[in-house]
Amino acid sequence: MTQTQLKSPHPARDWPFQVIPLHPVLGCEIIGITLAQAVSPAIFAKVYEAFLDYQLILFRDVDLPPTTQVAFAHNFGEVQIHVLSQYHGYKEHPEIYTLSNLDKDGNPSGKHSDKGTLYWHTDGSWRERSGQATMMYSEIVPEVGGETEFADMYSAYDLLPPTIKSKIDGRRAIHNFDFSRTRRHGEDPLTAEQKAKVPPIAHPIVRTHPDTGRKAIFLGDHAEWIEGMDYEGGRALIEELNLMITPPARVYTHSWNPRECMV
């Protein structure tokens, strides 16, 4: 796909909006409708089709107060509440997880509020029921940095060598939030009560999406070890896979502007 094609609107099937691809592999911007229109059942059904096709959908220049954000998120299904309650930025809306490097006085702290998010991960893979999507909204963005990267896990599986596929098909990885936050990155944001709520959980390394029927890799930084393998061997395979499935050519890097909503 050429740069001209990436920047040109696509007429997009029978959708009541147009899409602009963000990257040759994944992601699109939706134009021609507002978020208020997108939540109507008839239009949202088409928005969801775009989400399934492109894996990422972006709305630019939108007002998204907490109440509206939670309401829009409910269109995708049950909205989960993050176990790290210290990041719940709105008392009335615990569904919203807030990340900021500003202190209580609004000044840059010089610290990243959640360093674990700097590594490749699948949001909420440490849950027994992992979510199908994450909704992000930008309020204040830095002049430099702060990008978010997304990798295509469909093609990650499709392009794996047959020898690697045979190693992982049918296997499960143990995802452990305490491992990824405490032992792996040297931070300990979880209280004892929070740790008890998120014990290690097993998920298939290769999952089939129920709506698209496509196979995808389900790994990332929260995956600690692999059932049926010795610990060190499983760790080595996870590290190898995490490198193989995130090559630059299949990664979209999003540079944020204020008032953007990404799902």
Regions found by a protein language model. Name each.
Residues T2-C261:
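Non-heme Fe(II) oxygenase catalytic core, chiefly the N-lobe of the double-stranded beta-helix
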